């Protein structure tokens, strides 16, 4: 099928595919409990209950690990916005609705587990963490909200294709964060979360592939738009750019990882450059996609140069941005108004 379909028509056409992949997801998902991966015996009361409040010396995580863990947590915290956006695009009926609710339930556990780990292990300032979490959820994640002016999803194919890349990127970020923690408990926790994210990615990736078979030109338009303007959902977090630099320089997630481990594998799975069913604007956009990839390659090269400059500067001056400094919220948070 190559005729243009409305979102409602596409939802109907893809319903059997969604039901098939939902059942596959349920059969592949391995149950796990977040509380099993929190070192509760390491915890102790804070001042309000007669204990001691947080001190920076109590954190056993590196600056990179602290920044990455907090960024991952506050990104997961914005689940109310993600649920709204996905529900608006995919609907709440039938297999689509069952998937939206199942996905939301699984994602909700990730934020709970990450917050428990950080607070129990005293890895970061819990007061600053709560201020940041409130701010991030208040800012939300929605096209045009708070005059952000950033692209998200305007159609069903926009939404499904975007999360195909985003879930894979999140899986890799979580897994690399676990390794950066240098703590076997954190590594196990992040491995469990990453496994969930991988199954989410597989679901969206394969539903997207079915969309390419049904409406190749529509899907190609979405693909070109997404890769040209891609941003991780945590872009609205205060000090995002500075935190992203720390995470990238630390090897958790950088432009090269994004291109080689996220973008290219998904494009290969969808056979974007081998397909022969693109016509008109779809064919033109597919050709232009090669230029988008070239731009991503250039971004990788520029990042490596910038990374080396920063490392040289830190070695020369002995100064580097600390996680504690980045997570201080004073003067950075202004609760957003709609």
Swiss-Prot record:
Location of the protein in the cell: Cell surface
Which cysteine pairs are covalently linked by disulfides here? none
Binding positions (Fe cation 2): 107, 167, 197, 200
EC number(s) given by UniProt: 1.14.19.-
UniProt remark on cofactor binding: Binds 2 Fe(2+) ions per subunit.
Question: Is Cell inner membrane one of the keywords?
Answer: no
Chain residues that bind Fe cation 1: 76, 107, 110, 197
CDD domains, per database record = Acyl_ACP_Desat
Q: Which cofactor does it need?
A: Fe(2+)
Q: Where is this region: Disordered?
A: 314-338
Q: Under which pathway is this protein filed?
A: Lipid metabolism; fatty acid metabolism
- GO CC annotations? cell surface; cytosol; peptidoglycan-based cell wall; plasma membrane
What's one GO BP annotation on this UniProt entry? fatty acid biosynthetic process
Write out the entry's keywords from A to Z: Fatty acid biosynthesis, Fatty acid metabolism, Iron, Lipid biosynthesis, Lipid metabolism, Metal-binding, Oxidoreductase
How does this protein assemble? Homodimer.
Entry function: May be a desaturase involved in mycobacterial fatty acid biosynthesis.
Q: Which family does it belong to?
A: Belongs to the fatty acid desaturase type 2 family.
Misc: Is a major B-cell antigen.
Full protein name: Putative acyl-[acyl-carrier-protein] desaturase DesA1
**What is the organism field in this record?**
Mycobacterium tuberculosis (strain ATCC 25618 / H37Rv)
* Taxonomic lineage of the native organism: Bacteria, Bacillati, Actinomycetota, Actinomycetes, Mycobacteriales
């Amino acid at each position: 099928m190559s005729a243009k379909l409305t979102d409602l028509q596409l939802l109907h056409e893809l319903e059997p595919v969604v039901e098939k992949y939902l059942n596959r997801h349920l059969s592949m998902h391995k149950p796990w409990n977040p509380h099993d991966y929190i070192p509760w015996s390491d915890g102790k009361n804070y001042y309000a209950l007669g204990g001691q409040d947080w001190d920076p010396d109590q954190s056993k995580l590196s600056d990179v690990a602290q920044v990455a863990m907090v960024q991952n947590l506050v990104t997961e915290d914005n689940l109310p916005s993600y649920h709204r956006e996905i529900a608006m695009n995919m609907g709440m009926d039938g297999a689509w609705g069952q998937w939206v609710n199942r996905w939301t339930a699984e994602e909700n556990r990730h934020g709970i587990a990450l917050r428990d780990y950080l607070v129990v292990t005293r890895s970061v300032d819990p007061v600053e963490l709560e201020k940041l979490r409130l701010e991030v959820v208040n800012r939300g994640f929605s096209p045009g909200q708070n005059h952000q002016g950033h692209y998200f999803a305007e159609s069903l194919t926009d939404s499904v294709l975007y999360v195909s890349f985003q879930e894979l990127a999140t899986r890799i970020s979580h897994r690399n964060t676990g390794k950066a923690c240098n703590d076997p408990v954190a590594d196990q926790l992040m491995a469990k979360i990453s496994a969930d994210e991988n199954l989410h990615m597989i679901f969206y990736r394969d539903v997207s592939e079915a969309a390419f078979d049904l409406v190749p030109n529509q899907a190609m338009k979405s693909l070109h738009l997404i890769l040209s303007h891609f941003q991780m959902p945590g872009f609205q977090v205060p000090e995002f750019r500075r935190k992203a630099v720390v995470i990238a320089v630390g090897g958790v997630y950088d432009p090269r990882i994004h291109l080689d481990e996220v973008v290219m594998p998904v494009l290969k799975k969808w056979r974007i450059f081998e397909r022969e069913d693109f016509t008109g604007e779809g064919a033109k956009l597919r050709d232009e996609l090669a230029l988008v990839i070239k731009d991503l390659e250039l971004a990788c090269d520029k990042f490596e140069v910038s990374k080396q400059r920063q490392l040289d500067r830190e070695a020369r001056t002995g100064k580097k941005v600390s996680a504690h400094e980045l997570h201080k919220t004073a003067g950075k948070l202004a609760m957003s108004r709609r």
